[in-house]
Amino acid sequence: TYNVYSDGSKKKVNEYTHNEVDAKNFNAKTSDMLPEAIENMSIYQNEVNDVVKYTNEFRTEAGKEPLKLDETLTKAAMVRAIEMAYSNKFSHERPDGNMCYYIMRDFGQDIYGVGENIASRQRNAKEVSYAWKGSQGHYENMISSSFTRIGIGVIKFYGTYYWVQLFQY
């Protein structure tokens, strides 16, 4: 940004930088993202615990048993959050074209009996949890009696949060 004066001179007063991510060629595998996912489990530990807390409060209100936080599901959810952020593909479909639940194969688990909620832009666990509660399909996943375990993924990338809940029987 410049101040331009009547004599034609100008003075630079601010420099604007624009960061844009080129995600067209994103092709990372789960194994590529796993070290960051594991690190993010520590970085976002409070957010993970808070989403689980809100989810279990909603389940209690609905007369359901609480979900148990599962380490493998959390790793998988963290990878899902990372791949959505880095690929700029906010979808239940993974960047490789497979559906979201196929991530479980990368962790040696069955793809059946898996549910996923995704969200972006909410700034904290309370916001995202209540956004999911306010959406019928997401809320149904949260309170489903079929699910017994949960994993949470979150990443803040260029100022935007990406959130993932993975549920499993």
Task: Give residue ranges: language-model regions.
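Mature extracellular or exoplasmic CAP/SCP-family domains and secreted bioactive peptides
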Residues: 129-131
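N-terminal targeting leaders of exported, membrane, and organelle-targeted proteins
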Residues: 1-89, 145-169
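Short, surface-exposed glycine/acidic/tryptophan-bearing loops
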Residues: 75-126
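Short active-site loop/helix that positions an aromatic residue
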Residues: 139-144
